[in-house]
Amino acid sequence: MKKAGIIGYGRFGRVLADLLSKKYAVRVYDIEKVADDEGVEICSLDEVLECILVFIVVPIRAFEQVVKEIATYTLY
């Protein structure tokens, strides 16, 4: 099964994970410790960035910092 990654697991991230889990294995990264939900694997940022799709769903105040951080990774 193809993997989709979500950075940020707040309200919007949870809704997105629920929708994606119907067709993808969903990996989630959040700076806060979060519990595993059914159909979601809590992972490191490295593991999420290995996914074929990655969604950034963080608060707007954190968006720029997250983009700068993931820009240092080698992505597809």
Give short role names for the model-derived ranges.
Residues 3, 38-39, 50, 54:
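Short N-terminal micro-motifs specific to bacterial/archaeal maturation
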Residues 19-38:
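NAD(P)-binding Rossmann-fold cofactor-contacting core
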Residues 1-3, 45:
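Short, Lys/Arg-enriched, disordered terminal segments
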Residues 45-74:
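Rossmann-like NAD(P)-binding element
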Residues 4-8:
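Conserved N-terminal Rossmann-fold NAD(P)-binding element of oxidoreductases
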Residues 12:
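Hydrophobic/small residue at the entry helix of a nucleotide-binding pocket
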Residues 36-45, 74-76:
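Active-site regions of enzymes building and remodeling cell-envelope glycoconjugates
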